[in-house]
Structures are given as structure tokens and as C-alpha cells.
Amino acid sequence: MISNNLIEQLEQRGLIAQVTDKTRLSERLYQGQISLYCGFDPTADSLHLGHLVPLLCLKRFQLVGHKPIILVGGATGLIGDPSFKAGERKLNDIDTVHQWVNKIREQVEPFLDFDCGNHSATIENNHNWFSHINVLTFLRDIGKHFSVNQMMNKEAVKQRLSRTDSGISFTEFSYNLLQSYDFAYLNKNHKVELQIGGSDQWGNITSGIDLTHRLNRRSVYGLTVPLITKADGSKFGKTEGNTIWLDAKKTSPYQFYQFWLNTADADVYRFLKLFTFIDLNAIDALEEQDKKNDKAPQAQYVLANEITEMVHGKEGLSAAQRITASLFTGNPHDMREEDFSQLAQDGIPIVRLETDAELQKALVSAQLAPSRSQARTLIQSSSISVNGKKQLKPEYIFTSEDRLLDRYTLLRRGKKYYCLIIWQ
């Protein structure tokens, strides 16, 4: 099962930003199974899209027979990684961080196989070893291996020191030592030979390689995946300023699906290589097919379907597709209670109204019309639909028949603008 060209495959997908000693790492991977890890600090109660590429990279290694370890930073999450951050992170209390650790553990489990023999995935928490090290031992046994001069020359630290509005605290400055020790500890106790992470972690990874060599006298490797950018230069992983989370309670499967569906043509084929396991030849064939097709490209649908199912499962994908189809046609009658809940969460604007409200008032309250007179004009011009049906009566008052599931009514102005009424 061990692949002798995994590094080459990752490069072809654009998944390698930096790698230490690529030739020797490739040779080591060819020789047999290795253990590798990627760390995820609990800086929130959910992972977001930025975590997805390294997480899926672990899966790519596991699929060819290597053993992945998820390291949840129960200790490092209490400190905060300063890497390329403009200012000091807010320190979260221990109870909060421990709650986030548990949520992240639950979140990563579906991505890897924890029951596949000798390459089963495992999850570790660095709080388990740091909680047993006192400060004197750490400074004597670990700190002595670090040069402050070299630490200050790390690009992430240099950027912080160059800012006049914020420096860097000793707390965050010491983060590099903690992450480095993680690598040395995992190498000694779990035979880990490779750390992967985002390209912003390069300085921390190379420090860990150096410390592991000093403490354990073993050769280990580092590999970073690129930080994802969009072709137009805008930030990846956000929509209208809001982070796209992996937790369905923070970003609904519908909104998650829409994010990928709205991927620009300039990005979509690259994202298929980065985020899916579709064969590269199949992706190239899809691109050629889309170029020849006069209709809308299919790549966005393939991308949205693949990743939504991967993160939210078949039910999450089905719900996202059902909601999308209902909004496209303007007919919400096939939607379920949980579908309306997703729309209310973050899908479209909502307005809560009392019984027997007028349509004109609802349109103004929903900001689909700036005034009652404009609402009247929109109704008379056939621009307003109620649950998919044109409503032409300017003085229309909602009835119980307009309430889907006895609670919801979908308003639409034109083809693009929606609002969900939730009846009180």
C-alpha cells in the first residue's frame, strides 16, 4: 500500500509549500510506514476552512499506509501562536480551552480512520505532557537548546517586533519552544518522523526538527501546505466577512455548500486538487469539458458536493441541495423543518412577525422594499412571490395557508432577494 511517489503526487496537486530534504523524505516514505502529525490549537470552539487542507493532507498519508496523529494543543492553546499575527492573542481560561479541545477532537474524528490496523489514526493532547513539566526543568532541559538570536530572526517574530503599535510578549515568544518540544516528545514516544502544517508554521516546524535532533539524535522531517489564496486576492475561507466554520452550528451545511458553489472559475479547478481526492486526470477532463460547454461549468457543483459531503455527511449534503433547489425555483414546499432552521441560522435574512400581518408591512420589515408605497409598486409589477407564488394584491394579508409547517413563509423579490418570515 505504501506509495513511492506520494511527495510527487502532493506536488502535482499544489499541496507542498515547503519541505525539508525532499529527496531523503521521499526515500524514507518509500522504505515503509512512518508516523506523522499535525497540530491544531483550540483557539475557538470549531475548526474552520483554513484547517481543512492540512487535515486532509493527513488523510492522504493514511490512505497510502502511513499512521497519522492529530495533536490537539490543550497546552499550546493556552499560550497562543504569534506566527504572522498582527497583535497579541487574547488568553482564554483553562476551562474554555479544555471545552474547545473536546469539540475539536470530535470534529476531526470523521476525517480519519481510527480502526484500520497498524496505521490507525490517534489523537494526542499536549497538555498531557506539559502539565507534568515544571518551569525549571523546561528552562534547563529544553530552553538551553534555543538561541534567542535565532528565535528573533524567525520571520513571524521579526514581523511582530517591527510593528510600532505592538511587540511580542514573552508568553507568545516562548510558543516556539513548546511546539518544538511537541515534535521531540512525539518522536521519542510515538516514533513520529514528520510534522505537517500550514506554511505559517515553517519556523516552528524547523525549530522542532532541530530540537528533536539535539534531544533524540534522530532525523525527522517537516512539510507545509500552502495557505490558500483566491485568484482575485481576496481572503479565502470567509463570506461577507464571516468565517466559514466546520461546525454545522456555526456555519450551516447550506451556507457551507453555497460558499463552494460560488467559487470563481479561476479558482475552482485548483480547489478541486487541494480539497478533494478526485483523480487529477478526472479534474483535467472536467476542466476541458467545462471549456467546451456553453452552459454553466459543472466544476463548482462537483466541488461543493464533494466537500460538503466530506464535512457534513450525506444528510448534510442532501439538505444543502434541497434548500438550494427550493430557493432557485422559489418553491419551498419540499423543505423540512431542519431546512428552514438552516436558512434562519445563516442562509437568508429573517423577520419575525405577528399573526395577520400585511404583505406591504412584511416587505418593509424584511428590507425587500424601502417603503410601503414602494412595496405596493413591487407587488403590482409582479415582483413579489409568497412561497413561490406571485402575489398581485397590494393589500394582501397573510393567512394560515401561507404558513409552511405552521411557522414559515418565504418571500422573494425578483429572482435574487429572499426573506424568511418566522411567525410568532
Curated annotation (Swiss-Prot):
Keywords: Aminoacyl-tRNA synthetase, ATP-binding, Cytoplasm, Ligase, Nucleotide-binding, Protein biosynthesis, RNA-binding
SMART domains, sorted: S4 (SM00363)
Gene3D superfamilies: HUPs, RNA-binding S4 domain, Tyrosyl-Transfer RNA Synthetase
Database matches in PROSITE patterns: AA_TRNA_LIGASE_I, S4
EC number: 6.1.1.1
Record-level GO cellular component terms: cytosol
Signal sequence range: none
Primary subcellular site in the record, as a coarse category: cytoplasm
GO biological process: tyrosyl-tRNA aminoacylation
Binding site for ATP: K238
Subcellular locations according to the entry: Cytoplasm
CDD domains the UniProt entry points to: S4, TyrRS_core
Residue numbers covered by motif 'KMSKS' region: 235-239
Known partners and oligomeric status: Homodimer.
Job description of the protein: Catalyzes the attachment of tyrosine to tRNA(Tyr) in a two-step reaction: tyrosine is first activated by ATP to form Tyr-AMP and then transferred to the acceptor end of tRNA(Tyr).
Family the entry assigns: Belongs to the class-I aminoacyl-tRNA synthetase family. TyrS type 1 subfamily.
Descriptive protein name: Tyrosine--tRNA ligase
Organism expressing this protein natively: Hamiltonella defensa subsp. Acyrthosiphon pisum (strain 5AT)
